[in-house]
Protein backbone atom coordinates (compact mmCIF):
# COMPACT_ATOMS: atom_id res chain seq x y z
CA UNK A 1 0.00 0.00 0.00
CA UNK A 2 1.45 3.35 -1.03
CA UNK A 3 1.15 6.50 1.04
CA UNK A 4 -1.64 7.75 -1.24
CA UNK A 5 -3.57 4.49 -1.41
CA UNK A 6 -6.66 4.99 0.75
CA UNK A 7 -7.57 2.71 3.62
CA UNK A 8 -11.02 1.39 2.69
CA UNK A 9 -13.49 1.58 5.58
CA UNK A 10 -17.18 0.68 5.58
CA UNK A 11 -19.69 2.26 7.95
CA UNK A 12 -23.36 1.74 8.63
CA UNK A 13 -25.85 4.49 9.43
CA UNK A 14 -28.70 2.59 11.08
CA UNK A 15 -32.03 4.44 11.03
CA UNK A 16 -34.89 3.26 13.26
CA UNK A 17 -38.63 3.63 12.75
CA UNK A 18 -38.59 7.08 14.35
CA UNK A 19 -35.91 8.36 11.99
CA UNK A 20 -33.17 8.33 14.62
CA UNK A 21 -29.60 7.33 13.75
CA UNK A 22 -27.34 5.03 15.77
CA UNK A 23 -23.92 6.39 16.70
CA UNK A 24 -21.08 4.74 18.62
CA UNK A 25 -18.51 6.27 20.96
CA UNK A 26 -14.90 5.23 20.49
CA UNK A 27 -13.79 3.43 23.68
CA UNK A 28 -10.77 4.17 25.84
CA UNK A 29 -7.55 2.84 24.39
CA UNK A 30 -8.42 3.68 20.79
CA UNK A 31 -7.30 6.73 18.87
CA UNK A 32 -9.74 9.64 19.26
CA UNK A 33 -11.35 7.94 22.25
CA UNK A 34 -14.57 9.57 23.38
CA UNK A 35 -15.52 10.87 19.92
CA UNK A 36 -18.64 9.57 18.20
CA UNK A 37 -18.79 7.79 14.85
CA UNK A 38 -20.90 5.41 12.80
CA UNK A 39 -20.32 1.68 13.41
CA UNK A 40 -18.02 -0.06 10.94
CA UNK A 41 -14.42 -0.87 10.19
CA UNK A 42 -11.83 -1.79 7.58
CA UNK A 43 -12.80 -3.78 4.51
CA UNK A 44 -10.72 -6.90 3.94
CA UNK A 45 -9.03 -7.32 0.57
CA UNK A 46 -11.25 -10.20 -0.58
CA UNK A 47 -14.54 -8.62 0.55
CA UNK A 48 -17.12 -6.62 -1.35
CA UNK A 49 -18.23 -3.44 0.45
CA UNK A 50 -21.58 -5.05 1.33
CA UNK A 51 -19.89 -8.18 2.69
CA UNK A 52 -17.60 -6.00 4.81
CA UNK A 53 -20.60 -4.05 6.11
CA UNK A 54 -22.38 -7.27 7.08
CA UNK A 55 -19.32 -8.61 8.91
CA UNK A 56 -18.42 -5.38 10.72
CA UNK A 57 -21.94 -4.73 12.03
CA UNK A 58 -22.29 -8.33 13.17
CA UNK A 59 -18.95 -8.13 15.01
CA UNK A 60 -19.49 -4.67 16.52
CA UNK A 61 -23.20 -4.50 17.35
CA UNK A 62 -24.52 -8.03 16.81
CA UNK A 63 -26.96 -7.49 13.96
CA UNK A 64 -27.47 -8.97 10.51
CA UNK A 65 -28.13 -6.41 7.80
CA UNK A 66 -31.41 -7.09 5.97
CA UNK A 67 -31.67 -3.98 3.79
CA UNK A 68 -29.07 -1.32 3.06
CA UNK A 69 -28.16 1.08 0.27
CA UNK A 70 -25.12 3.26 -0.43
CA UNK A 71 -25.35 6.68 1.21
CA UNK A 72 -22.06 8.49 0.55
CA UNK A 73 -18.34 7.93 0.04
CA UNK A 74 -16.02 10.26 1.93
CA UNK A 75 -12.27 10.70 1.54
CA UNK A 76 -10.43 12.06 4.57
CA UNK A 77 -6.87 12.46 5.78
CA UNK A 78 -6.45 12.75 9.55
CA UNK A 79 -3.04 14.42 9.21
CA UNK A 80 -0.69 15.41 6.36
CA UNK A 81 1.51 12.41 7.13
CA UNK A 82 -1.33 9.89 7.44
CA UNK A 83 -2.65 7.84 4.53
CA UNK A 84 -6.07 8.86 3.22
CA UNK A 85 -9.16 7.02 4.38
CA UNK A 86 -12.07 6.18 2.11
CA UNK A 87 -15.27 5.78 4.13
CA UNK A 88 -18.02 3.95 2.25
CA UNK A 89 -21.13 4.64 4.33
CA UNK A 90 -24.36 2.69 3.84
CA UNK A 91 -27.85 3.58 5.00
CA UNK A 92 -29.11 0.54 6.93
CA UNK A 93 -32.90 0.51 7.03
CA UNK A 94 -33.68 -3.03 8.19
CA UNK A 95 -31.77 -5.57 10.26
CA UNK A 96 -32.24 -8.73 12.29
CA UNK A 97 -31.18 -9.18 15.89
CA UNK A 98 -30.90 -6.96 18.94
CA UNK A 99 -28.36 -4.15 18.86
CA UNK A 100 -25.68 -4.62 21.51
CA UNK A 101 -22.26 -3.19 22.32
CA UNK A 102 -19.77 -5.94 21.49
CA UNK A 103 -16.64 -3.78 21.18
CA UNK A 104 -16.74 -1.86 24.47
CA UNK A 105 -18.32 1.18 22.84
CA UNK A 106 -21.23 3.26 24.11
CA UNK A 107 -24.20 3.37 21.74
CA UNK A 108 -27.03 5.86 21.46
CA UNK A 109 -29.82 6.87 19.12
CA UNK A 110 -29.65 10.45 17.90
CA UNK A 111 -32.17 12.60 16.03
CA UNK A 112 -30.87 13.58 12.59
CA UNK A 113 -31.01 17.29 13.37
CA UNK A 114 -29.14 16.74 16.64
CA UNK A 115 -26.20 15.02 14.93
CA UNK A 116 -24.29 18.31 14.38
CA UNK A 117 -24.19 18.74 18.18
CA UNK A 118 -22.70 15.29 18.76
CA UNK A 119 -18.92 15.15 18.97
CA UNK A 120 -18.71 13.32 15.64
CA UNK A 121 -15.34 12.52 14.06
CA UNK A 122 -14.34 15.06 11.42
CA UNK A 123 -14.15 12.26 8.86
CA UNK A 124 -17.85 11.53 9.42
CA UNK A 125 -19.16 15.10 9.12
CA UNK A 126 -20.15 14.69 5.47
CA UNK A 127 -22.10 11.57 6.49
CA UNK A 128 -24.03 13.70 8.97
CA UNK A 129 -24.91 16.12 6.18
CA UNK A 130 -25.98 13.29 3.88
CA UNK A 131 -28.26 11.91 6.58
CA UNK A 132 -29.93 15.28 7.06
CA UNK A 133 -30.54 15.71 3.34
CA UNK A 134 -33.53 14.06 1.63
CA UNK A 135 -32.97 11.60 -1.23
CA UNK A 136 -34.61 13.80 -3.88
CA UNK A 137 -34.80 17.44 -5.00
CA UNK A 138 -37.79 18.63 -7.04
CA UNK A 139 -38.12 21.90 -8.97
CA UNK A 140 -41.62 23.43 -8.58
CA UNK A 141 -42.55 26.65 -10.39
CA UNK A 142 -45.68 27.47 -8.37
CA UNK A 143 -44.74 27.73 -4.67
CA UNK A 144 -48.38 27.63 -3.57
CA UNK A 145 -48.79 24.23 -5.25
CA UNK A 146 -46.65 22.77 -2.47
CA UNK A 147 -49.83 22.65 -0.41
CA UNK A 148 -50.90 19.70 -2.57
CA UNK A 149 -47.89 17.77 -1.28
CA UNK A 150 -48.89 18.03 2.37
CA UNK A 151 -51.73 15.44 2.49
CA UNK A 152 -49.39 12.73 1.18
CA UNK A 153 -46.36 13.82 3.19
CA UNK A 154 -46.70 11.02 5.74
CA UNK A 155 -46.79 8.41 3.01
CA UNK A 156 -43.60 9.29 1.14
CA UNK A 157 -39.91 9.82 1.69
CA UNK A 158 -38.55 13.20 2.64
CA UNK A 159 -37.94 15.56 -0.28
CA UNK A 160 -36.46 18.97 -0.99
CA UNK A 161 -38.43 21.50 -3.01
CA UNK A 162 -36.79 24.20 -5.16
CA UNK A 163 -39.13 27.16 -5.66
CA UNK A 164 -38.75 30.67 -7.14
CA UNK A 165 -40.26 32.24 -3.99
CA UNK A 166 -41.74 31.15 -0.69
CA UNK A 167 -45.45 30.14 -0.60
CA UNK A 168 -47.79 32.95 0.37
CA UNK A 169 -49.17 30.82 3.20
CA UNK A 170 -46.26 30.28 5.63
CA UNK A 171 -48.03 27.27 7.17
CA UNK A 172 -47.36 25.30 3.96
CA UNK A 173 -43.62 25.47 4.49
CA UNK A 174 -43.98 24.79 8.19
CA UNK A 175 -46.04 21.64 7.66
CA UNK A 176 -43.65 20.33 5.02
CA UNK A 177 -40.69 20.97 7.29
CA UNK A 178 -42.49 19.15 10.13
CA UNK A 179 -42.39 16.08 7.88
CA UNK A 180 -38.65 16.55 7.33
CA UNK A 181 -38.84 18.23 3.93
CA UNK A 182 -36.56 21.10 2.94
CA UNK A 183 -37.67 24.16 0.97
CA UNK A 184 -35.14 26.21 -1.02
CA UNK A 185 -35.62 29.43 -2.96
CA UNK A 186 -33.65 30.46 -6.03
CA UNK A 187 -34.03 34.21 -5.50
CA UNK A 188 -32.63 35.54 -2.20
CA UNK A 189 -34.79 38.66 -2.62
CA UNK A 190 -37.83 36.41 -2.25
CA UNK A 191 -36.87 35.16 1.20
CA UNK A 192 -39.29 35.84 4.06
CA UNK A 193 -38.57 38.44 6.70
CA UNK A 194 -36.09 37.13 9.25
CA UNK A 195 -34.36 34.82 6.79
CA UNK A 196 -31.01 35.32 5.14
CA UNK A 197 -29.89 34.19 1.71
CA UNK A 198 -26.59 34.44 -0.08
CA UNK A 199 -25.36 34.01 -3.60
CA UNK A 200 -21.80 32.89 -4.21
CA UNK A 201 -20.26 31.88 -7.51
CA UNK A 202 -23.00 30.14 -9.43
CA UNK A 203 -26.54 29.71 -8.21
CA UNK A 204 -26.81 29.16 -4.50
CA UNK A 205 -29.88 27.61 -2.89
CA UNK A 206 -30.46 28.64 0.66
CA UNK A 207 -33.16 29.51 3.11
CA UNK A 208 -31.64 30.03 6.50
CA UNK A 209 -33.90 31.51 9.15
CA UNK A 210 -31.93 33.20 11.92
CA UNK A 211 -30.81 30.54 14.40
CA UNK A 212 -31.77 27.60 12.16
CA UNK A 213 -29.55 24.96 10.59
CA UNK A 214 -30.96 24.76 7.10
CA UNK A 215 -28.39 23.27 4.77
CA UNK A 216 -27.07 25.36 1.90
CA UNK A 217 -26.42 24.01 -1.58
CA UNK A 218 -24.97 25.28 -4.82
CA UNK A 219 -25.44 24.50 -8.50
CA UNK A 220 -22.09 23.68 -10.15
CA UNK A 221 -21.07 22.90 -13.73
CA UNK A 222 -17.45 21.87 -13.28
CA UNK A 223 -14.93 20.55 -10.83
CA UNK A 224 -13.47 24.05 -10.42
CA UNK A 225 -16.88 25.43 -9.43
CA UNK A 226 -17.30 22.55 -7.00
CA UNK A 227 -14.00 23.40 -5.28
CA UNK A 228 -15.04 27.07 -5.11
CA UNK A 229 -18.35 26.03 -3.55
CA UNK A 230 -16.53 24.01 -0.91
CA UNK A 231 -14.41 27.07 -0.10
CA UNK A 232 -17.62 29.10 0.22
CA UNK A 233 -18.83 26.70 2.90
CA UNK A 234 -21.79 25.06 1.18
CA UNK A 235 -23.17 21.75 2.43
CA UNK A 236 -24.10 19.98 -0.82
CA UNK A 237 -23.87 20.33 -4.60
CA UNK A 238 -26.40 20.11 -7.43
CA UNK A 239 -25.05 19.05 -10.84
CA UNK A 240 -27.58 19.86 -13.59
CA UNK A 241 -25.50 18.76 -16.57
CA UNK A 242 -25.50 14.97 -16.72
CA UNK A 243 -23.24 15.12 -19.82
CA UNK A 244 -20.22 16.34 -17.86
CA UNK A 245 -16.99 14.47 -18.72
CA UNK A 246 -16.05 11.67 -16.36
CA UNK A 247 -12.99 13.56 -15.16
CA UNK A 248 -15.14 16.54 -14.11
CA UNK A 249 -17.56 14.27 -12.25
CA UNK A 250 -14.61 12.60 -10.54
CA UNK A 251 -13.45 15.99 -9.23
CA UNK A 252 -16.96 16.78 -7.98
CA UNK A 253 -17.21 13.36 -6.33
CA UNK A 254 -13.86 13.93 -4.63
CA UNK A 255 -14.89 17.20 -2.98
CA UNK A 256 -16.19 15.38 0.09
CA UNK A 257 -19.73 16.80 -0.09
CA UNK A 258 -23.02 15.06 -0.83
CA UNK A 259 -24.01 15.84 -4.40
CA UNK A 260 -27.04 15.33 -6.61
CA UNK A 261 -27.10 14.80 -10.36
CA UNK A 262 -29.90 15.72 -12.74
CA UNK A 263 -31.73 12.67 -14.08
CA UNK A 264 -34.71 14.40 -15.73
CA UNK A 265 -33.57 17.40 -17.76
CA UNK A 266 -31.90 17.00 -21.18
CA UNK A 267 -28.13 16.90 -21.15
CA UNK A 268 -26.56 20.29 -21.69
CA UNK A 269 -24.95 23.27 -20.01
CA UNK A 270 -28.18 24.97 -18.87
CA UNK A 271 -28.36 25.66 -15.14
CA UNK A 272 -31.99 24.92 -14.32
CA UNK A 273 -34.96 24.57 -16.71
CA UNK A 274 -37.22 27.60 -16.78
CA UNK A 275 -40.36 25.52 -16.27
CA UNK A 276 -41.40 22.12 -15.07
CA UNK A 277 -40.08 19.78 -12.46
CA UNK A 278 -36.45 18.90 -12.04
CA UNK A 279 -35.56 15.76 -10.14
CA UNK A 280 -32.15 15.20 -8.63
CA UNK A 281 -30.98 11.71 -7.81
CA UNK A 282 -27.86 11.08 -5.83
CA UNK A 283 -24.90 9.57 -7.59
CA UNK A 284 -23.23 6.51 -6.00
CA UNK A 285 -21.10 8.87 -3.90
CA UNK A 286 -24.13 10.89 -2.81
CA UNK A 287 -27.64 10.35 -1.45
CA UNK A 288 -29.48 7.77 -3.53
CA UNK A 289 -33.08 6.80 -4.12
CA UNK A 290 -33.87 3.18 -3.25
Model-predicted regions and their roles:
Residues 145-217, 223-225:
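N-terminal active-site wall of soluble small-molecule enzyme domains
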Residues 184, 190-196, 205, 216, ...:
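Catalytic cores of alpha/beta
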Residues 20-60:
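Conserved Nudix-box catalytic region and its N-terminal flanking loop in Nudix hydrolases
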Residues 235-244, 264-290:
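Glycine-rich phosphate-binding active-site loops on the catalytic face of alpha/beta enzymes
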Residues 1-21:
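Conserved N-terminal beta-strand and adjoining loop/helix that marks the start
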Residues 74-99:
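Active-site-adjacent beta-strand/loop module that shapes the phosphate/pyrophosphate-binding cleft
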Residues 63-73, 90:
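A short coil-to-beta-strand element that immediately follows conserved catalytic motifs
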Residues 35, 99-159, 289-290:
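Nudix hydrolase/Nudix homology domain
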Amino acid sequence: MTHDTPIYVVAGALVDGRGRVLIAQRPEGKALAGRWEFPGGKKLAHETPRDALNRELLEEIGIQVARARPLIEVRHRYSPDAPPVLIDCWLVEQWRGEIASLDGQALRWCEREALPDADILEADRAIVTALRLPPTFVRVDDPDSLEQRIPTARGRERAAWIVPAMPRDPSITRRLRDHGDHVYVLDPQALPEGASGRIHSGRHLEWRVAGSRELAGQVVHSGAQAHAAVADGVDFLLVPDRALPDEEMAVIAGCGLPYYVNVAAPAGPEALPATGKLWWKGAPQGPVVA
